[in-house]
Design a protein with these regions (language model features):
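Short loop/turn motifs that connect adjacent beta-strands in outer-membrane beta-barrel proteins
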Residues: 16-22, 57-67, 101-111, 153-161
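Extracellular loop and loop/strand-boundary signature of outer-membrane beta-barrel proteins
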Residues: 36-44, 78-87, 129-135
Length: 171
């Protein structure tokens, strides 16, 4: 088992399974959020969110392809401008994709391109509405995706810089 730091926000763990390396990064994030759901309220709500993400990339039996699994959970609490009402919400996002892989620069640069499916389930609850206090959310999308990974060594340790893009095509 080897451990590599990706940036400063996550730790990536690689397991050697049948000489195939599985990369897994887990991240926790806390930050600001803006919520505008005009079904529940015409007001924009601002607040805080907490998010957990697990991202796994592993090779398949087919040499040039890899499989990507991403799980993401989010909880949020936000208030309106008058600060007399709150909304709470939660989301779960699952992404599954297959990508074709290219290596460049002697294996230091790794490029991936492919497509997958993205599923989102969630809710928003307005604490003060009496008639329709909640809204459920669900979506299914076909998602082309790409990634670029640059591997390097610093301070005698392996590091990876990874950039990914997902663009909903249909759904």
């Amino acid at each position: 088992v080897s451990v590599a730091q990706d940036g400063g926000d996550s730790v990536s763990v690689a397991h050697n399974i049948d000489s195939r390396i599985v990369h897994n990064a887990r991240m926790i994030a806390v930050g600001a959020t803006d919520v505008l759901d005009t079904y529940l309220s015409p007001e924009k709500y601002t607040g805080i969110e907490m998010r957990y993400m697990s991202h796994t990339t592993k090779p398949t039996r087919f040499d040039r392809f890899s499989m990507v699994l991403s799980h993401q959970g989010e909880l949020l609490k936000a208030h309106n401008r008058a600060d007399n009402n709150d909304e709470i919400g939660g989301y779960y996002n699952f992404h599954y994709a297959w990508r074709y892989n290219w290596n460049a620069m002697g294996g230091k640069l790794h490029l991936e391109a492919g497509a997958g499916a993205d599923v989102l389930l969630g809710f928003i609850y307005n604490l003060r509405n009496g008639n329709n206090p909640a809204q459920a959310k669900m979506s299914l999308s076909i998602v082309p995706s790409a990634a670029a990974v640059y591997n390097f060594n610093a301070w005698h340790k392996p590091f990876s810089l990874r950039y990914e893009v997902f663009v909903p095509l249909a759904g």
